[in-house]
């Protein structure tokens, strides 16, 4: 076990008193024993699976709680932060008063006082000059395991004199009984204070709150320094060619960037500075619903000792039923990045990106499997951040639900979306990068585009054959589509071919175009936004 001479006395500075014992930066073996301790109850308890990984449940919180997210409004954030408009659903950055913050902080520090605590010191960001040194404090072993997997693990030398830039206090066992009087959403809370540099978590057990909390902080700090902060995966080819994959949850970021032919930089959060693209994280957080060894062998084989499964169904014999979504469709696994064989080592960073891929899972069946974007279309589709989900309705009818999430990650943005677009475009122009829109969703047949076809499309983008292909223009959206690509069924490249008649596509496409136009109106309050309208669909 690594020791940093951290004492209970040191924790008094955070308001945490009478700590019984500190388990500092525990080893994986220690965490394994702690999680499987038969004396644990409820959501603290881990279960051993036949794959060697421990599985835990996070209760009713099987995903993030965006409605319970708050940021303290003070002199630091008042004029810089992208605040939510009450009830307009623009984003989740709801302001919190200093008074309520102090109350929430008191609840969490009281919860952690007098306990045996796990403390993990780690880095967020692979570049030493811009990384955050983060200290995580929790009373739950598997939460310490989660952050050890997901953040960058310091060397023993780096732990000597480790000074945290940010403190995360996870009080999952405490709730806020005064939430109504304080005008909050519920008794649960995920609160950030960018002046005190502290994140507080109460009520929710979902591990991803710690991960995305620090992502929100990086999304605040980096663009103000001219560094792109991106919700994307990234990988690098044998010739050093870097590709980044933007996309919302479930569009294929992790799956498509985990490619045996290319080395993985990271699967979810990256920066892009003067040296190139770098990972914020030290692990991957992959969806496991319907995971199969055949379709996603790298991810399947990463699920072994030291990986941590969340909300999966474990049978009595210890086998995992990856097809069972009864607890949630958002079943997950976190694992240290070195569980993937083909990674960039020793530091998760590479040169400048030349291919920028926007992933969308279009459940309307309108968008083509791939199109090549102009510079203005790149900004338009980045700000739109479109995907669509299939949601079950009463009589078994599935109606697609459109989602527009600025920069393919509105939930984690702390500055105005146009600031991220400007920084990304500058980085792309300097590197001569080209953007593409790839639909990993459905077509007119009602079937999802196969991983095999999507991988062949990605290969064509990365090896340059798509750039050399002849293209035609798709009406309404004015997207440039290749007429043929190696290894891809030519019939599916034009989405109109997958409908009984072109009129059927036209009808659905018109409806989707209207949604795009309506959504983009929120960006037309600036001349830069107004200038991009012509890059979108035209009715």
UniProtKB/Swiss-Prot annotation:
Record flagged with keyword Cytoplasm: yes
Main location: cytoplasm
Entry GO MF terms: ATP binding; metal ion binding; phosphoenolpyruvate carboxykinase (ATP) activity
Entry GO CC: cytosol
Entry EC no(s): 4.1.1.49
Localization per record: Cytoplasm
Pathway of action: Carbohydrate biosynthesis; gluconeogenesis
Co-factor(s): Mn(2+)
Binding-site residues for substrate, renumbered to this chain: 64, 206, 212, 332
Annotated binding of Mn(2+), by residue: 212, 231, 268
Signal peptide: none
Pfam family, one: PEPCK_ATP
Record-linked InterPro entries: PEP_carboxykinase_ATP, PEP_carboxykinase_C, PEP_carboxykinase_N, PEPCK_ATP_CS
Cofactor note as given: Binds 1 Mn(2+) ion per subunit.
Catalytic activity: oxaloacetate + ATP = phosphoenolpyruvate + ADP + CO2
Keyword tags: ATP-binding, Cytoplasm, Decarboxylase, Gluconeogenesis, Lyase, Manganese, Metal-binding, Nucleotide-binding
Chain ranges passing through the membrane: none
Family: Belongs to the phosphoenolpyruvate carboxykinase (ATP) family.
HAMAP family: PEPCK_ATP (MF_00453)
Name of the protein this chain belongs to: Phosphoenolpyruvate carboxykinase (ATP)
Biological source species: Salmonella gallinarum (strain 287/91 / NCTC 13346)
């Amino acid at each position: 076990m690594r020791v940093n001479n951290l004492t209970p006395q040191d924790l008094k500075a955070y308001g945490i008193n009478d700590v019984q014992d500190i388990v500092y930066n525990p080893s994986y073996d220690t965490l394994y024993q702690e999680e499987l301790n038969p004396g644990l109850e409820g959501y603290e308890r881990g279960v051993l699976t036949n794959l060697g990984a421990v599985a835990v449940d996070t209760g009713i919180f099987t995903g993030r709680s965006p409605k319970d997210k708050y940021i303290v409004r003070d002199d630091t954030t008042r004029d810089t932060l992208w605040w939510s408009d009450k009830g307009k659903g623009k984003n989740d950055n709801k302001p919190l008063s200093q008074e309520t913050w102090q109350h929430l902080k008191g609840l969490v520090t009281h919860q952690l006082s007098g306990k045996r605590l796990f403390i993990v010191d780690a880095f967020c960001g692979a570049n030493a000059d811009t990384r955050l040194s983060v200290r995580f404090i929790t009373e739950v072993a598997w939460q310490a395991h989660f952050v050890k997997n997901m953040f960058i693990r310091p060397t023993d030398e780096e732990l000597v004199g480790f000074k945290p830039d940010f403190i995360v206090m996870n009080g999952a066992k405490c709730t806020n009984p005064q939430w109504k009087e304080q005008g909050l959403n519920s008794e649960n809370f995920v609160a950030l204070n960018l002046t005190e540099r502290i994140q507080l978590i109460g009520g929710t057990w979902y591990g991803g709150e710690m991960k995305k909390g620090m992502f929100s902080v990086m999304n605040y700090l980096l663009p103000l320094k001219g560094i792109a902060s991106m919700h994307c995966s990234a990988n690098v080819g044998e010739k050093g060619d870097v590709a980044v994959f933007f996309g919302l949850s479930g569009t294929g970021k992790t799956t498509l960037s985990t490619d045996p032919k290319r080395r993985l930089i990271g699967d979810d959060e990256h920066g892009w500075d003067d040296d190139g693209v770098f990972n914020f994280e030290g692990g991957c957080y992959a969806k496991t619903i319907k995971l199969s060894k055949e379709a996603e062998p790298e991810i399947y084989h990463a699920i072994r000792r030291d990986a941590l499964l969340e909300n999966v169904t474990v049978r009595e014999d210890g086998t995992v039923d990856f097809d069972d979504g009864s607890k949630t469709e958002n079943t997950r696994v976190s694992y240290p990045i070195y569980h993937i064989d083909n990674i960039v080592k020793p530091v998760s960073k590479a040169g400048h990106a030349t291919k920028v891929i926007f992933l969308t899972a279009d459940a309307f069946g309108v968008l083509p499997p791939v199109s090549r974007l102009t510079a203005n279309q790149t900004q338009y589709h980045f700000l739109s951040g479109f995907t669509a989900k299939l949601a079950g309705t009463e009589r078994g009818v599935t109606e697609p639900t459109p989602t527009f999430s600025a920069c393919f990650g509105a939930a984690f943005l702390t500055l105005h979306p146009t600031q991220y677009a400007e920084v990304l475009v500058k980085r792309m122009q300097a590197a001569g990068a080209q953007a593409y829109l790839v639909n990993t969703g459905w077509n007119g047949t009602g079937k999802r585009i196969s991983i095999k076809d999507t991988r062949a499309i990605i290969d064509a983008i990365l090896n340059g054959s798509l750039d050399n292909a002849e293209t035609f223009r798709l009406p309404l959206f004015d997207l440039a589509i290749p007429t043929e690509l190696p290894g891809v069924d030519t019939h599916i490249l034009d989405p109109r071919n997958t409908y009984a008649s072109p009129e059927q596509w036209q009808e659905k496409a018109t409806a989707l175009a209207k949604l795009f136009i309506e959504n983009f109106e929120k960006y037309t309050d600036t001349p830069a936004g107004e200038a991009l309208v012509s890059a979108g669909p035209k009715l």
